[in-house]
Design a protein with these regions (language model features):
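Extended, small-residue-rich solenoid/repeat segments and analogous flexible loops
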Residues: 1-25, 29
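Flexible, glycine/small-residue-enriched loop-and-beta-strand segment within the central core
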Residues: 23-32, 37-128
């Protein structure tokens, strides 16, 4: 599996672990540092839904991502080194538009908001 990850991700660091099942979209746009741990049933995505040519999702060295995390980049999300997230954390640089109340949210465009950068050593608690 490690060889598959090294070939599929933009970068996949040494001693990193991903626990399955996991949903991943846009692997070629995702960089995972050394000694990263991604727990059960997390969702990683780096896809150009808002028009960005090469969206970026970076997870820094020594970071641990908890169970059921959802990390979605349409332009740029960078998670620093030695970051710890609890379970059920949502991190995204985009949101669902709700500009026309006569149209269901699911039928409206994805809206790009600011890039996200989580600093080194950050702790993000559960259900954030």
């Amino acid at each position: 599996m490690r060889v598959f990850f090294k070939l599929s991700f933009k970068e996949y660091g040494k001693n990193s672990s991903i626990i399955f099942p996991l949903n991943i979209q846009g692997m070629k746009n995702i960089s995972i540092g050394d000694n990263v741990y991604i727990a059960y049933k997390s969702y990683l995505a780096s896809v150009p839904l808002t028009g960005a040519e090469n969206p970026i999702l970076e997870i820094g060295d020594g970071t641990t991502i908890g169970n059921f995390n959802h990390i979605f980049a349409t332009e740029k999300v960078v998670i620093g080194k030695k970051v710890l997230t609890a379970d059920k954390v949502y991190i995204s640089d985009n949101l669902h538009s709700y500009e026309d109340v006569t149209i269901p949210i699911i039928d409206q465009k994805i809206k790009q908001i600011n890039h996200v950068e989580i600093g080194d050593g950050t702790w993000i608690g559960e259900n954030v």
